[in-house]
Amino acid sequence: MKLWDVVAVCLVLLHTASAFPLPAGKRLLEAPAEDHSLGHRRVPFALTSDSNMPEDYPDQFDDVMDFIQATIKRLKRSPDKQAAALPRRERNRQAAAASPENSRGKGRRGQRGKNRGCVLTAIHLNVTDLGLGYETKEELIFRYCSGSCESAETMYDKILKNLSRSRRLTSDKVGQACCRPVAFDDDLSFLDDNLVYHILRKHSAKRCGCI
């Protein structure tokens, strides 16, 4: 319950207590008849009491005040406990919700890596790292083809594979489709450490296919 809700409840209770009927021992005097002989009207009402006011005031008012004070004290103590408890529950819910998602995500990533086809992959290298005997500080983005070509197999490829397994084609080796470049990047020109000019042609893949 918020603070304003408690204040509203307290106001309603105070209004209810103030609307209680007068306690026993208090009564209203009836209005006296008009005195025509004196030519003026006396005071119409008067309040009389058999006892003092503080002793006859309803006990319910004290109960209402006690309830209001207890509610305010309880409300002051509760926010800190709720603030400490809610984050724990929220963290537990988030952890429980994240675990299945993480496991499903890992499963999907594993399936994509296992069943992916022939794709183009890039890596940042130095020309010297290519192992062609060049000593240079020149760098490049080397792209290569990788992946499986099983999904690209035609009926012809399947028949050849079956015949090879059954040893019907023992005299010949049957080649399988592999992931290869079908187009290459532009030529790469560079100077080595001895200021010798070199050109690399068809050095990096541009598009890949199963051939």
UniProtKB/Swiss-Prot annotation:
Residues 20-75 form a propeptide. It comes from the Eukaryota. Residues 76-113 are annotated as: Disordered. It holds the Pfam family TGF_beta. Its main location: secreted. One of its GO terms (biological process) is mRNA stabilization. Disulfide bonds join C118-C179, C145-C208, C149-C210. One of its GO terms (molecular function) is growth factor activity. Homodimer; disulfide-linked. Interacts with GFRA1 coreceptor and RET: forms a 2:2:2 ternary complex composed of GDNF ligand, GFRA1 and RET receptor. Interacts (via propeptide) with SORL1 (via N-terminal ectodomain); this interaction affects GDNF-regulated, but not constitutive secretion. Also interacts with SORL1 in complex with GFRA1; this interaction leads to GDNF endocytosis and lysosomal degradation. This is Glial cell line-derived neurotrophic factor. It comes from Mus musculus. The lineage of its organism: Eukaryota, Metazoa, Chordata, Craniata, Vertebrata. The gene is Gdnf.
